[in-house]
Amino acid sequence: MTNMMKALVKTKPEVGLWMERVPVPEVGPNDVLIRVKKSAICGTDVHIWNWDQWAQKTIPVPMVVGHEFMGEIAEVGSAVTKHHVGERVSGEGHIVCGKCRNCRAGRGHLCRNTLGVGVNRPGSFAEFVCLPEYNVVTIPDDVPDEIAAIFDPFGNAVHTALSFDLVGEDVLVTGAGPIGIMGALVAKRSGARKVVITDINPVRLDLARKLGIDHVVDASKENLADVMRSIGMTEGFDVGLEMSGAAPAFRDMIDKMNNGGKIAILGIAPAGFEIDWNKVIFKMLNLKGIYGREMFETWYKMIAFVQGGLDLAPVITHRIGIDAFRDGFEAMRSGNSGKVVMDWI
């Protein structure tokens, strides 16, 4: 195996990413080297491409980016015992310390020392990515490669949707991006009664309809209260999944929640936006922030959803070779795509 590889690198502090030749990561005793077969573009990667304020504060340059992927193990460290060369795998993109209180209590997703693959350390937009053995997840044979490549965002959807009991509940999802759509599908499959998803992007609303979500609402043209009446809802929503990061959508969600309702918040909202806290208080709402995936309960659940017949393939709207990465980023930046999966092989 050569000691150099192709990778998408943030080589300069400006808009864009560049295909470069960089050294293959060195494998430590507890590490696993993975030959990447497919990788997907995340919203985080778009922030890095755009070199916005968050990226400028967060991303060291140069940096190999990307964290949504699947591949095959190419090499294992001398102390690795649970994985072997040739195994199909994906990986948890949050590297946790294992030493803090939350890690020691089995709550690694709450680690205050988390490092992000493709953010704080070299990522998976490359021919090879190196992860600690702890972070590597075996992919069963009945899970397709391209679906395994989007397990990171699917995990965000599963973690958010399953934060609260959904059986018999009416669920509102704000934001029909890929994660919002997958969250709505999980809610529907987990026993929710009514599942309503809102957005203002016609392409994403059409994608939500294509995937079989029953109640798809264009918030720019339809009044949510009217929709609720038309589908027989006499009270507010029991569970809210905020996936949009849009202040108007979040405010509308709070307004439409039933007393005692529960909201899981994944969408990253603009700093300092206002909500009516009196409604939160007098409705006795429960608000819960969501970041990443539970380690590794979320991974087991999302594998089970796929093995149980949940078809996520339509969420992937663009399948391209890695040399066309600019086209993939253009699709993501336009807002008129679902998931974009890039083939490295």
Swiss-Prot record:
It is an enzyme of class 1 (oxidoreductase). It comes from the Bacteria. It catalyses: L-threonine + NAD(+) = (2S)-2-amino-3-oxobutanoate + NADH + H(+). The active site is at 44 (charge relay system), 47 (charge relay system). GO terms for biological process: L-threonine catabolic process to glycine. NAD(+) binds at residues 179, 199, 204, 266-268, 290-291. Its cofactor is Zn(2+). GO terms for molecular function: L-threonine 3-dehydrogenase activity; zinc ion binding. Gene3D superfamilies: Medium-chain alcohol dehydrogenases, catalytic domain, NAD(P)-binding Rossmann-like Domain. Keywords: Cytoplasm, Metal-binding, NAD, Oxidoreductase, Zinc. Zn(2+) 2 binds at residues 97, 100, 103, 111. The keyword Mitochondrion does not apply. HAMAP family: Thr_dehydrog. Homotetramer. This is L-threonine 3-dehydrogenase. It comes from Sinorhizobium fredii (strain NBRC 101917 / NGR234).
